Regions:
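N-terminal "assembly arms/tails" that initiate or stabilize quaternary assembly
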Residues: 1-83
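Localized chelating/binding microdomains
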Residues: 49, 86, 132
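Extended oligomerization regions of viral-like shell subunits
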Residues: 162-251
Length: 251
């Protein structure tokens, strides 16, 4: 009996969607909400939301007897823009006769392909998010701390957190390469608490309660300088990275 291709594709998609929904929920919780992955499609090529920008220096010291000129503050809006990125998979060849010969149900192939696609899709979402975060933070010199001249230490992470001043307590997570975390271990940072493990993504916690999201995302390693590989480590607050799945994963 020939296995219906439409049914096969539907089963593959159902398994992929169910698997990724479950693992996204676990990942979001384990990462402290610093990286939020979710299945929430939006219309059009962009999602644009406006919000009022915080006004600095609203309270001032005044001279009760003065008559000087005051400089007014302006209420401004800022835009939160999300860009839709298309993703898909190569066509996957499947021979039902192989399963009939071995007396197995061809539906097993749909299940296994769906599970593999879910893992690959989640990794792609994370890599794309990290690529954007590295570019965004890298263009803000005030939020960068260069410790590439020495092996990574917890002191270096603390110096990076200090860039945020009294807002450093808002940091929820460090996103770092596996090479960096191993060097931190070599420098006496010991932590056996493993919160989440998923296809090359590990989440552990530092002494201040910030979690370490360990993944070998391509943009966490930079070999472009010609003087060896430098590793990027991101300190993230809650909802620093939000990735919506567009629910349009096609071949």
């Amino acid at each position: 009996m020939a296995f219906d291709l439409q049914v096969f594709n539907a089963q593959t998609r159902d398994v992929m969607t169910e698997t990724i929904d479950q693992d996204i929920a676990k990942f979001n919780e384990a990462s402290g909400g610093a990286i939020v992955l979710m299945n929430k499609p939006f219309e059009g090529d962009f999602s644009i939301e406006a919000a009022f920008q915080a006004i600095g220096g609203l309270v001032r010291r005044r001279d009760a007897y003065g008559s000087g000129t005051l400089t007014p503050k302006r209420l401004k809006e800022m835009l939160d823009v999300a860009v839709k990125v298309a993703a898909g998979t190569e066509p996957i060849e499947f021979e039902p006769g192989q399963y009939h010969w071995t007396l197995r149900n061809p539906e097993l192939a749909a299940i296994k392909i769906g599970e593999q696609l879910a893992k690959a899709r989640m990794a792609d979402m994370l890599n794309a998010a990290i690529r954007c975060a590295v570019a965004a933070i890298g263009n803000n010199a005030a939020m960068k701390h260069d410790a590439s001249s020495a092996a990574p230490t917890f002191n270096a992470l603390n110096a990076g957190a200090a860039k945020m001043g009294d807002r450093s307590g808002a940091l929820r997570a460090w996103v770092l390469h596996s090479t960096t975390i191993h060097n931190l271990y070599d420098n006496a940072l010991t932590n056996a608490e493993r919160l989440f493990t998923y296809e090359g993504i590990n989440v552990v916690r530092d002494p201040f309660g910030r979690v370490f999201v360990v993944t070998d995302a391509p943009d966490l390693a930079d070999s472009s300088g010609g003087s060896g590989t430098k590793y990027n480590t991101l300190g993230l607050v809650e909802n620093a990275i939000v990735v919506n799945d567009s629910n349009d994963f096609n071949a």
